Amino acid sequence: MLGIKGSPVNTAYDVVNLQQGTIEWLEWRNNGIGASDAPVIMGENPWKSPADLLLEKLGTAKKFEGNAAMARGTALEPEARKRYEAISKICVAPACRQSNKHNWQRASIDGLAASGNTVVEIKCGESVYRRTVNSRQVPS
């Protein structure tokens, strides 16, 4: 990454070249702590306990195959990203980052600008999905 006048920007995170959704990506995620894990660790996730997360990280939890809502979110994410780009005029791409100081700190980012100064988290809730299907319009 380059900063002012082409000088390198010191970042706390290294680029991890993985395609999100692959087996390799899932293994990488499971071998560290990411943003999605934080609410679980804090006891703020009503669907997963810290003990469940620990079993996941140890590889001993019952494998979760996902559900219809997750499948919809995954399917809509590329279109939501395009819509964000059209509105904001900022190009973003999925990205994986890992702390260069604490390699267990990880981020699987829905959208990151090449400059590194814009991060997008995409959520496609069911009510938004229904409105989108009915109106045939991507929400703004």
Q: Model-derived features: where do they sit?
A:
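Charged, glycine-rich intrinsically disordered N-terminal tails and low-complexity linkers that flank
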Residues: 1-75
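Mg2+/Mn2+-dependent nuclease catalytic core
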Residues: 62-63, 68-140
